[in-house]
């Protein structure tokens, strides 16, 4: 029913509209998991994954429509500047969708006070920031723990850890979007939920502190997720290009070169985001 009420074509003329779609889909996902699975002794343990899966199901029509449209436009572009110009609206639409996910996940998680809703995301956060003390970290940063922000790793080690994790996500996004274009939304929705969990930790689960938490994580989060979106777009475009033209067609070669250009841009952005996260953001939020 949702895909009938909300037409993906509307996102073409106003990428900002995707913000409200992200808010709606993430909110519905949280509420469904909280009320349908919150009391289940087995499924409640996997609430963090189920929330993301619901978001993925809701978002697939938009992702497929955008990938299809972008591949058709990509066939005629050859320059790097031209590649950015024709794809920037799609990237902006993804970023607005991502922001909607983050705000809905963060607010919903804090208001519902269900520690299982983003349980896997909290563990992921701890695995990145405190790899040697994951269990202690999870206990500390849950609703029942005392949320005290600490930096468990030295900057150099943390930079390598974060950059390695980010490039791993980037490769996974590329492969996932190539195999099943719209499937890359899983990686993107998952990252939105992890950032939401991190914002909850940073704000000590206080609604009034959410704007500060958003600033804290969006300084590096927006360029980072933009790199993932560009990668997802590249994989989706390549997948559709193979289906439409095969691998021997001249149009496919043009599409392939543009995809390589997009991945190069994404890689540069990802390195910059890691530098900001490790060396710049801590100076503002000590």
Language-model segment annotations:
Residues 272-286:
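Juxtamembrane boundary at the C-terminal end of a transmembrane helix
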Residues 1-63, 104-111, 200:
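Transmembrane alpha-helical insertion/packing segments
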Residues 65-84:
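Membrane-helix interface/capping segments
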Residues 199-267, 271-272:
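Hydrophobic alpha-helical transmembrane segments and adjacent short intramembrane/lumenal linkers
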Residues 95-112, 179-186, 220-223, 266-268:
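Hydrophobic alpha-helical membrane-insertion segments
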Residues 7-20, 42-50, 82-99, 256-264:
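Alpha-helical transmembrane segments and their helix-start/interface "positive-inside/aromatic belt" motifs
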């Amino acid at each position: 029913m949702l895909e009938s009420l909300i037409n993906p074509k509307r996102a073409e003329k106003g990428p900002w509209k995707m913000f409200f779609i992200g808010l709606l889909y993430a909110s519905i996902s949280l509420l469904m998991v909280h009320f349908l699975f919150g009391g289940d002794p087995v499924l409640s343990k996997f609430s963090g994954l189920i929330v993301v899966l619901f978001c993925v199901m809701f978002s697939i029509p938009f992702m497929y429509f955008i990938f299809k449209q972008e591949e058709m436009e990509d066939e005629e572009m050859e320059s790097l500047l031209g590649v950015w110009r024709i794809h920037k609206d799609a990237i902006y639409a993804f970023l607005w969708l991502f922001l909607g996910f983050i705000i809905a996940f963060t607010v919903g998680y804090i208001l519902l006070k269900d520690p299982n809703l983003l349980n896997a995301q909290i563990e992921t956060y701890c695995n990145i920031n405190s790899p040697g003390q994951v269990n202690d970290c999870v206990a500390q940063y849950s609703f029942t723990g005392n949320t005290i922000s600490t930096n468990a790793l030295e900057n150099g080690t943390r930079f390598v850890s974060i950059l390695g994790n980010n490039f791993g996500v980037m490769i996974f996004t590329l492969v996932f979007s190539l195999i099943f274009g719209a499937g890359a939304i899983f990686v993107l929705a998952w990252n939105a939920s992890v950032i939401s969990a991190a914002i909850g930790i940073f704000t000590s689960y206080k609604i009034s502190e959410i704007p500060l938490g958003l600033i804290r994580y969006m300084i590096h989060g927006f360029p980072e997720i933009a790199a993932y979106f560009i990668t997802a777009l590249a994989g989706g475009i390549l997948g559709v290009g193979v289906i439409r033209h095969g691998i021997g067609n001249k149009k496919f070669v043009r599409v392939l070169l543009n995809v390589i250009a997009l991945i190069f841009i994404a890689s540069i952005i990802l390195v910059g985001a890691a530098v900001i996260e490790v060396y710049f953001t801590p100076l503002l939020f000590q």
